[in-house]
Amino acid sequence: MLMKNHFKTLVTLVACMSVVPAFAQMMGGPRGGMGMGGPPALDFGGSMGKLFGNNPDFTADIEMQMPGRSGGETMTVPGKIAVADGKSRFEMDMANMKGGNMPAEAASQMKAMGMDQMVTISLPKEKTTYMVYPGLQAYAPVTMRNPEAAKPESDFKIETTELGKETVDGHPCVKNKAVVTDDQGNKHESTIWNATDLHNFPVKIETQEQGRTMTMLFKDVKLTKPDASLFEPPSGYKKYDSQMALMQDTMMKQMGRGGMMMHPPQQ
């Protein structure tokens, strides 16, 4: 029974850790550029950054929606986002996720491991993402694999075509088709709803990924520059060499609580 519980914990951990990369594919430059080999972070550099026009710095509540495969239940992931100078910070709580194929006990098990809350800090110029876990007071760096990450804004051009006018979350919007082209001729197409009362901020973005429409909704948008400290890992947290090392140490602690030998973390 003990080993069965540990196996369920491991399965839950892997399932939860794979959630954000699925959404990151819609935001990380070339489609699939982030994939499973990239960090589970939201990248607002590259082609994605062009969609925000003259609004490079902001904070907002964000909700990401992704339909399940073969007509499965839509997964919804809410969180908070802060963006400045191409850097981004995304905060999420596993307890607030809905739908998808997440195990029913996922939230409680992640909370027991101290991994229910997760913060990703994406630094495109450094090609690094920090995975931060407040419940563990720990973090780990991950190398960004998005080839667009460090490209200057001048390498991208955007063309928009008006599709109509709609209201989104109380904001009057112009619905546009947006096509971003990089210096290699690669094109990324999205549908965006630019709020005319928010300096044309895109309060809704839709893009296609593997035949599915992925959606981002932004609420409580503030067009002010976030504090620079938000884009740095907490100084008092333990730093691991890799996310794998962090996960392994967390699993060993969990197994130790169940009566198995617990290995102390490497300093």
Language-model segment annotations:
Residues 12-16:
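Hydrophobic helical h-region of N-terminal Sec-dependent signal peptides
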Residues 2, 25-26:
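N-terminal acidic, proline/glycine-rich, low-complexity intrinsically disordered segments
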Residues 20-24:
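Sec/Tat signal peptide C-region and signal peptidase I cleavage site
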Residues 2-11:
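Bacterial N-terminal signal peptides that target proteins for export
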Residues 26-267:
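Extended soluble regions of mature proteins
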